[in-house]
Amino acid sequence: PTMAHVKDGWQVNDEWYLFTRFQDQSMHILALLDPGAERTLQDKYNVPNYPVIWCSAPGKGRVFYNAMGHREDVWENAEFQAMFSDAMTWTKGEGEADAAPNWAEAAPADLDPVSGAARVAAAAENNLPAK
């Protein structure tokens, strides 16, 4: 229910974090980032599409994570606002708690949760070619 107001192909111009480790065994991926043209700007951004919004439900709790919203204008986006409102409703226990891990189904096959993105980032930091 947290993504009910976000359409497929939703686009936002924002700064984003390059994650190097994921908790793939507990993540329920809700949205993937497509770095688009950024892939060609620096080797460290030449990564597969990867999770930027996810949730989990450890025990009786609920966790929602969103890596977006660095730019002020993103917070003015109606879909972004609706998503956060829905997410806060969900995290306080309302609605279905379906947050089963879905890494195998949702993440690109070439995104390794432990070493894939980390290898690219480490190579860029050390001025080495990414492999």
Where are these regions (language model features)?
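Catalytic beta-strand/loop cores that center a nucleophilic Ser/Cys/Thr
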Residues: 1-59
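Extracellular ligand-binding/catalytic regions of CAZymes and related secreted enzymes
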Residues: 36-53, 57-131
